[in-house]
Amino acid sequence: MQIPNTFNINAKANIYLPIHSEEALVEALQQHKNPFVLGGGSNMLLTQDITQPVLHILLKGISIVKENNDNVWIKAQAGENWHQFVQYTLSQGYGGLENLSLIYGNVGTTPVQNIGAYGVEIKDVMESCEAINIHTLQKRNFTNAECSFGYRESIFKGKEKGNYIITAVTFKLTKRNHLLHTEYGAIQQLLAERGLSSPTPKQLSEVIISIRQSKLPNPDTLGNCGSFFKNPIISKTNYEELKIQYPDIPSYSIDETQVKVPAGWLIDRAGLKGYRKGDAGVHNLQALVLVNYGKATGKEILAVAHYVQATVLKQFGITLEFEVNIF
């Protein structure tokens, strides 16, 4: 069968096993070694058929672990749709996940990538996650600190890569005195247009959704996996040198010696926004997004990605790293 993926790549699985419980997961791991673990299919590019057994993690359920007057600790099973979960928490009046609205994928993969948007990352809101060791079948609880979070990085992409399958994630959210992140220009502008000087988490989420919908394609209608490249982090010295030639190059300060530069701006300035080769290309509104216009193969999209990398490196001397996982 075709492996579900938001790039809409026609890649097939020899063995496909939908997993709806931890018991089913353990049983599948006893029978199938070296599995291919599938979540929401939203952060990967398939360049070939998958010969390994595909375990599709579909565990469902949302529950409150504990709460007090200020906070609530809420657990979501790995197969819960991320955006739907975010909207559920907002409907309950909880704050913390609003900036992460309309990110495609499932709950279980969010700690792996340490997903982030508009100044908020999973590391800022995750309390812990539960995972099963693929080799020993033992269950383990990882605290936030034990996940070794970095920019689009975690222990699950580093030291423990391929060793664990996340089954549930617990988030610490606010019930009052919400700390809202509205520092991005587009957010401030839209809040002002809507007359929202003190927005609720739900109102901020609606603004974020509006911004994302205005520039990001819906994978249901145009195959993509959101941001394909990481925003590169460069030295301030390098940035100041680039600023001489490109005075309008934007940046976000990381620390005293480093800044983050938007990859989308670099790709756009390199003249690649809207670039297309066959059915693979760079989106015409958001250069950070690669798209499948119809029947592109994973290899064709990867070729476009490599072309983008080479062009940006030649023009700016900056190497763009992939945010997506390539298989």
Identify the role of each PLM range.
Residues I3-I9, K139-L290, K295-K299, Q315-F327:
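Phosphate/pyrophosphate- and phosphate-bearing ligand-binding catalytic cores of soluble enzymes
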Residues A28-H32, E183-I187, V304-V308:
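Short amphipathic alpha-helices in soluble, non-transmembrane regions
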